[in-house]
């Protein structure tokens, strides 16, 4: 199966009141993409998610490691590079582009 490179982007914001910075995880389908500590206050970050995969639908999901201490917001999922769109369910849909020879 031929794979395509796609760069998905979304805006991420985490809010917490006190204590250590919260940690969050990002998954593509059910595969862990990254786990990070959120160290910024009052700031959205653009998170770039590289995907090298075959045609299909890919769900990008964020979760807090300890959800009782913070809230996470993810907005504006979009495709920056590659043959993909965001479908009606909010998933990245990779397609095979037509090749001219």
Residue ranges and their predicted role:
Residues 35, 39-40:
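A generic structural motif
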Residues 1-28, 34, 47, 53-101:
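Beta-strand-rich recognition domains
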